[in-house]
């Protein structure tokens, strides 16, 4: 059985998220067993929702290009959307709260904070998928000061520089995790931390996705990641 590099990043991201949940979970709100139940629900739900969202917006690919809609069931061939992870996490948190009889808002705060590490690893893994490359930029301060954020492409005698957007998104998620971690004590009411997190994350997505130039998950001219 083949092991895909991106799959290792997914596994690492899930591991980082669950460990972060165990370390940051409010002891009075829910137990460590609750984190285990959440993980058992979130993993399969994330795979299903990510695949489903990808297939919905890639129907032409399966119906017209491949001429075989049944290929949508071949999950081992790849084709997932990171955006599908968000509703999966929300549903998993709600189901876990019902099963464990704990506060959904408190659990969702913990899930939201820790999910930043999951998304960081998912974006880091895009380097293995040829996705997450940005538009052409001019050579200047950015290309010289931050060469690890720029991809150099040689076209004959010409050289083009493109932003490596997935690395920027990865770094942004790590920074967001640290900022939310330091500010969580200021969020006295349950659910406020999650509200802040997703508001900032959504704003980041709108900006970062606008820099991409990979043609992935486009609906006419709109990127699904921005929605």
Where are these regions (language model features)?
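A feature for loop-to-transmembrane-helix boundaries and adjacent hydrophobic helices
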Residues: 1-227
């Amino acid at each position: 059985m083949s092991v895909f590099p991106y799959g290792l990043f997914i596994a690492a991201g899930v591991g980082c998220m669950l460990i972060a949940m165990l370390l940051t979970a409010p002891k009075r709100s829910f137990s460590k067993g609750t984190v285990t139940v959440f993980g058992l629900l979130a993993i399969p739900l994330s795979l299903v929702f990510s695949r489903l969202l990808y297939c919905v917006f890639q129907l032409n690919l399966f119906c017209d290009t491949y001429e075989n809609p049944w290929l949508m069931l071949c999950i081992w061939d790849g084709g997932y959307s990171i955006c599908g992870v968000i509703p999966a996490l929300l549903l998993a948190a709600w189901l876990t709260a019902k099963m464990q009889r704990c506060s959904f808002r408190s659990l969702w705060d913990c899930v939201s904070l820790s999910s930043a590490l999951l998304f960081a690893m998912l974006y880091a893994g895009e380097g293995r998928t040829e996705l997450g490359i940005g538009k052409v930029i001019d050579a200047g301060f950015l290309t010289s000061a931050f060469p690890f954020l720029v991809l150099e492409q040689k076209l004959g005698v010409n050289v083009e520089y493109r932003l490596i957007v997935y690395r920027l998104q990865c770094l942004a998620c790590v920074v967001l995790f640290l900022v939310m971690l330091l500010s969580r004590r200021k969020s006295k009411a349950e659910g406020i931390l999650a509200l802040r997190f997703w508001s900032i994350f959504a704003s980041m997505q709108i900006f970062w996705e606008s820099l991409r130039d990979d043609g992935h998950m486009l609906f006419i001219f709109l990127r699904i990641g921005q929605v």
